Amino acid sequence: MTYTANDEENKGRSTDNNNHRQMDYNDWLPVTASREAKWYYSAFHNVTAMVGAGVLGLPFAMSQLGWGPGLVAIIMSWAITFYSLWQMVQLHEAVPGKRLDRYPELGQEAFGPKLGYWIVMPQQLLVQIASDIVYNVTGGKSLKKFVELLFPNLEHIRQTYYILGFAALQLVLSQSPDFNSIKIVSLLAALMSFLYSMIASVASIAKGTEHRPSTYGVRGDTVASMVFDAFNGIGTIAFAFAGHSVVLEIQATIPSTPEVPSKKPMWKGVVVAYIIVIICYLFVAISGYWAFGAHVEDDVLISLERPAWLIAAANFMVFIHVIGSYQVFAMIVFDTIESYLVKTLKFTPSTTLRLVARSTYVALICLVAVCIPFFGGLLGFFGGLVFSSTSYFLPCIIWLIMKRPKRFSAHWWCSWVAIVTGISIAILAPIGGMRHIILSARTYKLFS
């Protein structure tokens, strides 16, 4: 078989058309549609993604682990995930002339086009979906608490209706075209997360000065229950460091040049975000456990009742925050769904396609949130099941494959410590989380 000049010309035209179509797709997909983000966008996007519902569960995790193990787990998790996040920022442009804009693309570079995609994509989607389920539950519970504190005569309204109301709001916000279009929502969410963390800390300290436990034991009446609760506590802490699943996608929105690669402004934002994260986490975890001991609720704000106006304000701030967190995590799901629809199924990119796809996702998340509104168990179960992988050990495995650090060097040791820790969490935490869900389900009535 021979090729003519016309064949070569047609082949070149076909390649140009494919490249043009690919470029058009990237201009429409939410992750790559805009690359005009500033360094501080990455700061508040990361705070919004990280300081989510998980921070309110940290005193509960402390009550399951105790003072020493609880603080060690939080600080160690912060250090490990700070390191693994640095690895991901560095790997974003590790291949010359190419930007790895999405977590699955990084996996493909490390493990191969097919294997890499199927190793990373399902785990990333599970993180995004699990986060949105928890945020839907948290948004509904926080709004209910806010309303009941201000209007006690409305206590009869079911939690289900508040979860539905939160989902209705997400239906509207989910039509935002790309990551940068939700920057105001994300900024407001980041601000709220810091404020309600400080309110929870100050209110807990005030409560503790009036009356606090004389001893600080751990939950559980039997050795078995203590062990399972400890597993759940580890998963809850892992859930609090879930932001890695959106890091590359956030970095993809930042412009990059040979003189100023995207990793420089991105890392600047990450450092600011992680300083805010550890301040919020330690303040809330220590003050909440100090004030309530083993009797703290899985959401520390539920344990706080006075002053009513302050706790109402904190719950409303949580509600505002999880609105933004939901969007940050959902944007990656939207990108995956829409990419599949236009690239594989050959749908034409349109507003109608976006409306149908995103609305379907929000509705399904809401359905699960209504059926399984067990905040504490969800944190532990999902935190161990998939968050430990995407935040703790998967970035380190990819780093070892792509960068090949010298054996027994600092990076080699740090990576292996993170890998062993992450795998241990992945094995133990879901056991405790599932047990907590089963115990909660015994007293739960559907659509209550």
Swiss-Prot record:
Q: How does it sit in the membrane?
A: Multi-pass membrane protein
Cytoplasmic membrane side: 1-41, 86-114, 174-183, 244-269, 335-361, 404-411
Residue intervals annotated with topology Extracellular? 63-64, 136-155, 205-222, 291-313, 433-448
Q: Which GO terms describe its cellular component?
A: plasma membrane
Q: Please give the InterPro entries that the UniProt record associates with this protein.
A: AA_transpt_TM (IPR013057)
Q: Which domain of life is it from?
A: Eukaryota
Tagged with keyword Hydrolase: no
Q: Which UniProt keywords apply?
A: Amino-acid transport, Cell membrane, Membrane, Transmembrane, Transmembrane helix, Transport
A Pfam family of this chain: Aa_trans
Q: Where in the cell is it found?
A: Cell membrane
Q: Name one GO biological process term.
A: amino acid transport
TM spans (from-to):
42-62, 65-85, 115-135, 156-173, 184-204, 223-243, 270-290, 314-334, 362-382, 383-403, 412-432
**Function of the protein:** Amino acid transporter.
Q: Which family does it belong to?
A: Belongs to the amino acid/polyamine transporter 2 family. Amino acid/auxin permease (AAAP) (TC 2.A.18.2) subfamily.
- The name under which this protein is listed is Lysine histidine transporter-like 5
Q: Which organism was this protein described from?
A: Arabidopsis thaliana
